[in-house]
């Protein structure tokens, strides 16, 4: 999927010879080397959507007193489920349907809102995006009860706070359990707002997109940690591939500019990601080089960052 979204520099044909990565970057979905991958993306995405719908339907029927923090916690979980449903649908639309600027009026992807739904019908791009927006607006209002409180603001105030599994809210001032830690790995008020900005921009609703993006940026200013403070040293192609170059990377996972991230604890071993970080290459004097796999493509989005 990252190859499809043009995240990596695949221009060096001596390094990148794997056909399906190159085909994916060119959107050649019907290529025989890609078919199984495309089918798997579709299957996994709609399994996640089904799980979100199942959670929404069950939690709606659950009494708030069963949650440690009552109605606030119930609404937070429900909001995250709605946001997850919207996020997965939005990505499926971007992968498998034309963008609104090229909309041909055809139906491409179903928007599944109930569980189970064995044979959902595909719908057109515009009503599809309307459903994404509706789910995100609802999700944003549901998670606001926690994320806009003093505790919620603290939990999202910096990359370190957002991405830490340590429970910073466990003290006497807040007394929240581990469930409220690591908000950067959950769809919070500000990550939902940022996603809503993306959806609005994709739909051509630029004023709404600007309003949502401004809300996120202004929050970053108030918290003292800007979301757009980038540190790409040692990651992009132009920075070299020696061990020393990569050791200069002070924020390898770019936590400083992450609002939301998903993770899989088993991916490094189970999914074979480890193989992409082998130090197999060496210089003429035998010094090992960091892997050339999947170096990020540097794209400057703003001509003036002032």
What are these regions (language model features)?
Residues 82, 193-196, 200:
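TPR/Sel1-like alpha-solenoid repeat signature
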Residues 98-112:
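Short, flexible, mixed-charge acidic loops at enzyme active sites
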Residues 157-169, 180, 186-187, 201-204, ...:
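Hydrophobic-face positions in mid-chain alpha helices that act as interaction patches
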């Amino acid at each position: 999927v990252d190859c499809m979204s043009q995240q990596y520099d695949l221009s060096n044909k001596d390094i990148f010879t794997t056909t399906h990565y190159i085909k994916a970057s060119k959107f050649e979905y019907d290529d025989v080397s890609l078919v199984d991958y495309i089918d798997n993306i579709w299957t996994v995405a709609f399994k996640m959507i089904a799980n979100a719908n199942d959670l929404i339907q069950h939690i709606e029927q659950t009494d708030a007193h069963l949650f440690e923090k009552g109605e606030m916690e119930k609404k937070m979980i429900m909001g995250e489920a709605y946001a997850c449903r919207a996020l997965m649908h939005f990505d499926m639309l971007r992968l498998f349907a034309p963008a609104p600027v090229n909309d041909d009026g055809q139906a491409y992807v179903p928007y599944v809102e109930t569980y189970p739904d064995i044979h959902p019908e595909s719908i057109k791009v515009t009503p599809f995006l309307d459903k994404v927006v509706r789910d995100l607006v609802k999700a944003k209002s549901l998670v606001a009860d926690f994320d806009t409180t003093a505790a919620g603001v603290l939990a999202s105030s910096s990359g370190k706070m957002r991405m830490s599994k340590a429970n910073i809210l466990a003290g006497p001032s807040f007394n929240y359990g581990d469930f409220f830690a690591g908000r950067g790995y959950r769809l919070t008020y500000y990550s939902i707002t940022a996603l809503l900005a993306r959806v609005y921009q994709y739909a051509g609703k630029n004023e709404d997109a600007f309003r949502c993006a401004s809300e996120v940026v202004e929050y970053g200013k108030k918290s003292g940690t800007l979301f757009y403070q980038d540190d790409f040293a040692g990651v992009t192609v132009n920075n070299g591939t020696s061990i020393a170059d990569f050791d200069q990377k002070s924020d390898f996972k770019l936590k400083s500019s992450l609002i939301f991230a998903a993770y899989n604890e088993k991916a490094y071993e189970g999914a074979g990601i480890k193989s992409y970080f082998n130090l197999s290459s060496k210089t003429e004097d035998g010094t090992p080089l960091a892997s050339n796999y999947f170096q990020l493509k540097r794209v400057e989005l703003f001509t003036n960052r002032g």
